[in-house]
């Protein structure tokens, strides 16, 4: 019997490397891990594909989904709306697949109220200077937008202590190894092992 999948909430200020870490984690398309594809009203960035990176919808469509109680969580960030499909998450977890939510602290608080057992991971940059360097290096945003993101980052990072784990993304490979360690450790909990190896445990303890 396979254990129910774990729900991982991964949050970070923009530029901390959250999306890159999740992409690296799933690059080999593991069958037991899946990132949740959120709905958003923001415009696609260069290279982003609808249905793969996000489900891009209009504000009217998004509000209709909220009215239908279709979202596990939703939040407004920088004037854009983001939401996670409730049914998709539940169905995926029931198959024993770990799901990763790439969401901010507001969304994390909503998820924790519904599913307290969700595991929170917060990614931090090694310094403000490095965070600004990464944002500038993207070449996607104006100086005004970067300044706004830096100001927002301080607010976001103040919520790090609401999470179960914290990773400092100074060295990318080490940060990725840390993330993998967190994931695999959750599969070795007593509850997970009981579900996965129930028959074996019953046999071992039989008279």
From Swiss-Prot:
It is an enzyme of class 2 (transferase). It comes from Shewanella denitrificans (strain OS217 / ATCC BAA-1090 / DSM 15013). The gene is gmk. PANTHER family: GUANYLATE KINASE, GUANYLATE KINASE-RELATED. This is Guanylate kinase. ATP binds at residues 12-19. GO terms for molecular function: ATP binding; guanylate kinase activity. SMART domains: GuKc. One of its GO terms (cellular component) is cytosol. It catalyses: GMP + ATP = GDP + ADP. Essential for recycling GMP and indirectly, cGMP. Residues 5-184 form the Guanylate kinase-like domain. Its EC number is 2.7.4.8. Keywords: ATP-binding, Cytoplasm, Kinase, Nucleotide-binding, Transferase. The keyword Secreted does not apply. It is found in: Cytoplasm.
């Amino acid at each position: 019997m396979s254990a129910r999948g774990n729900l991982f909430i991964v949050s970070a200020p923009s530029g901390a490397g959250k999306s890159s870490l999740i992409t690296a984690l799933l690059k080999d398309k593991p069958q037991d891990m899946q990132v949740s594809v959120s709905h958003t009203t923001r415009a696609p960035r260069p290279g982003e594909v609808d249905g793969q990176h996000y489900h891009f919808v209009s504000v009217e469509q998004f509000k209709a989904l909220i009215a239908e109680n279709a979202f596990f969580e939703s939040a407004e960030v920088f004037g854009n709306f983001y939401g996670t499909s409730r049914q998709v998450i539940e169905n995926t977890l029931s198959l024993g697949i770990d799901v990763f939510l790439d969401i901010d602290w507001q969304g994390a608080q909503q998820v924790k109220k519904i599913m307290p057992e969700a595991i929170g991971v917060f990614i931090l940059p090694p310094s403000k200077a490095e965070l600004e360097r990464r944002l500038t290096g993207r070449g996607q945003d104006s100086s005004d937008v970067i300044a706004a993101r830096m100001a927002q980052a301080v607010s976001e990072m103040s919520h790090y202590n609401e999470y179960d784990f914290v990773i400092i993304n100074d060295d990318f490979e080490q940060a990725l190894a840390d993330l993998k360690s967190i994931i695999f450790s959750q599969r070795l909990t007593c509850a997970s092992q009981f579900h996965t190896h129930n028959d074996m445990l019953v046999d071992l303890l039989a008279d």
